[in-house]
Design a protein with these regions (language model features):
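Transmembrane-helix signature of polytopic, membrane-embedded enzymes
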Residues: 8-10, 87-110
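Membrane-proximal, lumen/periplasm-facing interface regions of secretory-pathway glyco-
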Residues: 312-373, 382-385, 389-393, 399-401, ...
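Transmembrane-lumen/periplasm boundary regions of multi-pass, lipid-linked membrane glycan transferases
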Residues: 170-261
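Extracytoplasmic catalytic/substrate-binding loops of multi-pass membrane glycan-assembly enzymes
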Residues: 23-38, 47-61, 66-70, 214
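Short acidic/glycine- and proline-prone juxtamembrane loop motifs at membrane-interface regions
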Residues: 119-126
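Membrane-interface transmembrane helices that cradle and orient dolichyl/undecaprenyl
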Residues: 134-149, 254-261
């Protein structure tokens, strides 16, 4: 017997609510630093820190419109809406009735993950729906006994590598799960091996780029681990609770139990364990398990369907309200610094103050007597992206990540307006004088707040050597 019918009307209502809410709030506090960075990157087959898909989307959309971030965020909104639908379809594959599908869709619509990564265009926005699609296809292959769905899963995973190579961790988790808890015969299936081959074939340009550029993703991963591991390893356990919201933890834990009790899909529990272990060992970012938790949540809703009533409806509503306040620009920008929101949601923190910062940096640049041999060099890509977006008349460079390779100041440059935390290094390379301190004016303590703006002259090394000294990955 096949799965229950798709309850499209009951699933699409919460999907539409999420899409409308995200669209209404899309301009919000302004661009996130990563959005500004992606928009500044010129199209390429890959970058030291990213595959090409999300930067290509951001650059293309940003070039169509020079106003706020709403257009840039349309793909993120679509990904969040897609995540709601896909998670409901996962519940259906697991035997969920129309009621279970509706509860799953409404539940996913209330999560911090869907609202945070649906509000800002990041690689995580795409991964949230891409990982769900891979898992949905694998479930269809196993539960419907239609192995051709393995090929679809492989194709989706191959496309997902253009967004982030992290999807390979999901595939590794599936392989480990099949090997450890079965069904082991799948490891001998030509459909599974065909899926693996299709992933490699579709993602081949990514492989070629990595091999011909000295495996930059490994270098980037090591840099992130060195910089972040001390914070990521303790915080990832907190993130497991807040990713979908504290009220939903009970449901996704019940989902893991339900998946474990079904021999056909028990391997998915191992997938979750592998992703959690990878997150801990790599220490790069805390949010990676978020991409597989929706599957466990859907399984939990199906398992707990008869217990879901008015009390759980209230809990879902509370979860949605708290998630919205955390994830979306509902608190006025002038007041948000006095709330916990910037501390809980770093994306909100990283979206506040860019116009003020650009004005302050621009004032230092405009005050220079000679612009012909002057540039702005920023310590991070957010500052560079903001200037490129809001002051296109200023020549701006950064030696962080992919911007290091994209361009460096001309050899004849004699004066630099240097912005941010690299001033100590710059003092050994130039004669520098601090002329301002960045201030967003709303008391939000983000990465830029209080950072110096310095005028640096008389470079002591040729620019190729200076640029190498300023280069950093993080």
């Amino acid at each position: 017997m096949g799965p229950p019918p798709v309850a499209w009307r009951r699933v699409l209502l919460p999907t539409a609510v999420v899409a409308v809410l995200l669209t209404v709030c899309s301009n919000g506090y302004g661009f996130d630093r990563d959005e500004l960075y992606f928009a500044m990157l010129r199209p390429a087959w890959g970058y030291v820190d990213q595959p090409p898909l999300t930067p290509l989307l951001a650059h293309g959309l940003a070039s169509l419109y020079d106003g706020g971030p709403w257009l840039l965020r349309v793909p993120a909104t679509l990904c969040a809406a897609g995540c709601v639908v896909v998670t409901a379809l996962v519940a259906r594959e697991l035997g969920g009735s129309a009621k279970a599908q509706a509860w799953t869709a409404w539940g996913m619509a209330t999560t911090t993950a869907a609202l945070v990564f649906g509000h800002v265009l990041l690689t995580s926005s795409v991964d949230l729906v891409a990982w769900g699609l891979v898992c949905l296809c694998v479930l269809r292959a196993e539960l419907r006994e239609q192995p051709r769905w393995w090929l679809v899963a492989g194709a989706v995973a191959g496309v997902a590598t253009y967004n982030k190579l992290l999807v390979l961790v999901l595939l590794a988790g599936i392989a480990v799960g099949l090997a450890l808890v079965g069904p082991r015969r799948r490891l001998l299936s030509p459909w599974v091996w065909g899926a693996a081959g299709l992933t490699v074939l579709v993602g081949l340009p990514n492989v070629v780029y990595q091999l011909t550029h000295d495996l930059p993703q490994l270098r980037m991963g090591r840099a992130l681990s060195e910089n972040n591991a001390g914070d990521v390893r303790p915080f990832m356990w907190v993130f497991l609770v807040i990713a979908l919201g504290p009220p939903l933890v009970v449901i996704w834990l019940a989902g893991l139990r339900a998946l474990w009790r079904d021999e056909r899909v028990r391997f998915l529990v191992v997938v979750v364990a592998v992703v959690v272990l990878f997150t801990f060992v790599s220490g790069a970012q805390p949010h990676y398990p978020m991409f597989v938790l929706p599957v466990a949540f859907a399984a939990g809703v199906v398992a707990m369907e008869r217990h879901l009533g008015r009390v759980w409806g209230v809990l879902f509503a509370v979860n949605g309200a708290v998630s919205a306040v955390i994830a979306l620009p509902l608190v006025p920008v002038g007041s948000v610094g006095a709330t916990p929101v910037p501390d809980v949601n770093l994306l909100a923190q990283d979206s506040i103050g860019w116009p003020a910062y650009v004005d302050q940096i621009g004032a230092a640049y405009d005050g220079l007597p000679d612009h012909a041999h002057a540039v702005v060099v920023t310590s991070n890509y957010g500052e560079a992206g903001a200037l490129a977006r809001m002051r296109p008349d200023v020549r701006v460079f950064s030696a962080q990540n992919a911007l290091f390779d994209q361009a460096r100041p001309p050899d004849g440059t004699t004066t630099v307006v240097l912005v941010g935390g690299q001033l100590p290094e710059a003092r050994g390379l130039f004669t520098c004088r601090v002329v301002a301190r960045l201030d967003n004016g709303v008391d939000v303590d983000n990465e830029e707040q209080g950072q110096p703006v310095a005028v640096c002259r008389d470079p002591r090394l040729p620019w190729p050597q200076l640029w190498d000294r300023l280069h950093h990955l993080d």
